[in-house]
Amino acid sequence: MSMNSSTEISQEPSIMKPVSSISSFVFNAGFLQGTFSDTTLIIKGETYHLHALFLGRSPVLLQKLIENNPKGDVHYTIEVETEDPYVTKESCLFVLSTLYCDSPRIPAEVNVCSVLAVSDLLGLDTLAFEASSLIEKSIRPETMESVIRFLDPNFEGLERLKMGMYPRFTSGLFNKAIQVMYNTLVSNWNTEYARLLCNLPFEVIKDLLESDKLTVGASSMARYKLANEIVKMRASFRKQNHIEGKGDESVVLAFDEGSRGIQLVHIAPGAESRRKIWKATSVR
């Protein structure tokens, strides 16, 4: 894509070559070359010279065009403010390019999480849902950490994880991720997979091990052994990588009204730490 030093789309006049279709002409002359642009769009300090006619396909940008040009001036200048770290220059370029196309598809080399973020920012629901679908299809044990980080960058807790940062498009992705983890733990447990659990937040491990959907053997002892192995590997991982401030985790057998199960125990760091006990199961 032709870009100058200010990351603006090139506005140099050029002789148009014959193209095979009007859509090709619009994309090449309009978006790539910025010919006859009438709108300056600013997103996170990056400037794009585009066309109000096509930007109007975004309900968010259309509203800004109307609000920022009450006198009907020939040229528009609009800005979209956001601090979302997933809104990047590359993702903005791709999403903006889709306004000049019919039925755009998200290429494999584009960060689909960033595409979802920009699509949500600009109110492009169809593209956002397509990005969400691609994220869901990409979920597997190896991608679990990045998916969870995308859903909840600050690890605010399970409620945020279940909804995600863009609830209309990300709610349900965490449940899908947990389901993949259930299936892997039950059918393909191995040391390599256990390592993938080392970096996940404790609340995620808790949710995984306490669920009735996780069937491990015929007794609570089998679940205890599995949970204990995971907790030990997480402790070893933190020690080897000098990760501090996470507190300690342990697993205990628990008895309640004749039934036996396990509990995951998390002891937070600091002098005022309190023991948090998470019930993982209640199996006889």
Curated annotation (Swiss-Prot):
It is found in: Cytoplasm; Nucleus. PROSITE patterns: BTB. Keywords: Cytoplasm, Nucleus, Ubl conjugation pathway. The keyword Transport does not apply. Probable substrate-specific adapter of an E3 ubiquitin-protein ligase complex which mediates the ubiquitination and subsequent proteasomal degradation of target proteins. PANTHER family: BTB/POZ DOMAIN-CONTAINING PROTEIN (PTHR47369), BTB_POZ DOMAIN-CONTAINING PROTEIN 2 (PTHR47369:SF2). This is BTB/POZ domain-containing protein 2. The gene is btb2.
